[in-house]
Amino acid sequence: MNLTSIDINILLADDDEDDCLFFKEALEELPISTKLTTVTDGNQLMQLLHKTEILPHVLFLDLNMPRKNGFECLSEIQISPSLRELPVIIFSTSFDKDSVNQLHDHGAHYYIRKPGEFAELKNVIHKALSTIEKNNFVKPTKDKFVLSL
């Protein structure tokens, strides 16, 4: 994936309408070309991933969603041979060290705590996309798992 030469296909799984809108607006202001698809619960996410022929370049995954939460989705992604290589960035308001460590151990690429300010959101999304590209989709060590500004 090259941030300047292709449309980056991003999938956002988040049940909060406002967060989805802010995410979309932040992407529109970044100097990169993206295509955003959103789903609002874990069941919808897994159905989409299992039926699509072309996976997104990256999944931003909220933890607290109805019907199937982000932890359950991440586990399901990691046990699926067709999905386990999908880069997953946890994108959540909740933050506790045990959960963060568990998410890293279960295959997530990065963890972003949802920022409260729009400018921070823009910057952290850009940082996440740039970092994942720079590292060629390789999962980071635990000390680099949490992305912040």
Short names for language-model regions:
Residues 38, 67-68:
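Residue-level signal for the "D+5" position in two-component response regulator receiver
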Residues 38-58:
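Acidic, metal-coordinating helix/loop segments flanking the phosphotransfer/catalytic sites
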Residues 61-63:
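Active-site residues of response regulator receiver
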Residues 125-149:
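CheY-like receiver
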Residues 7-27, 59:
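Conserved acidic segment of CheY-like receiver
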